[in-house]
């Protein structure tokens, strides 16, 4: 079968389209083989190509998000059958450690991600466990392959950040950095569902205008404005109750300056770098909570799928690229031009 692979880490020139062996014909008892119709890119895929501190088995197939059609099921699969239209939850737990038994699947000692630790979705067919698959809900208008592929990773990540970890409440002020990416746009929608007052930033006025149309209460250009000062002015010097920062080094200091007393800063990554610091005296005096968040558990995934079916969390697709042009999709993501998810159409 055809797949986009990397044979070494480095730049985007390492990505190539080639033939790879198809998944084994014999499935495990709870495994499902899915024919991929569309795959969506995430910053994780850029990090994989550049070289995460992992031992890859080359050639490695990137891609965490995907949607497609069930081709075959293992003997003990009870909830799916061939022909079902499905989307994938890329975070795979082993269901045997103490964290899994407590329902904290994203803390699993053997947690693995499609496209990172395992072969990914930039291919024609993948095998994943039954519990990592959801039937695509029926919506009007129908959810297309691109939207279904764009849904899982960013929505699950944003849901856990805002609902489970930061516990955003009605009337709170939430600051979201870097509107335009999939996680930040999902966070925007979830924060509005929670009844928050929403401040978002971007260096692109076009993205800020789009965010306003999507429900942002205030938009700030972090290329021309001092974000912490603006947030303090907007909140009568109180600061934000919650700051959503997945940018990292470039925004960390400003995030803390914008954070109010008793505030919560929640992070799922560091696209500009992982090394940050702060004065511990400010941490305990202002009684801040600094929260990490990664993906989500099975209950959270079921909840976001349910809400998608209710029409609440429909993802935003920036652009769809043909399978043959996947490298161009990576390049668009790397330039930060997107407003929503960059998707690759694998098959019709």
Each PLM stretch: what is its role?
Residues 226-236:
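Short amphipathic alpha-helix with an adjacent loop that forms part of the alpha/beta core around
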Residues 35, 92-178:
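NAD(P)H dinucleotide-binding glycine-rich loop of Rossmann-like/cofactor-binding domains
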Residues 1-4, 237, 312-316, 328-348:
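C-terminal capping/lid region of NAD(P)-dependent oxidoreductase domains
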Residues 142-225:
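Mid-domain Rossmann-like dinucleotide-binding core that forms the NAD(H)/NADP(H) cofactor-binding site
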Residues 87, 243-244:
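N-terminal Rossmann-like NAD(P) cofactor-binding module of classical short-chain dehydrogenase/reductase
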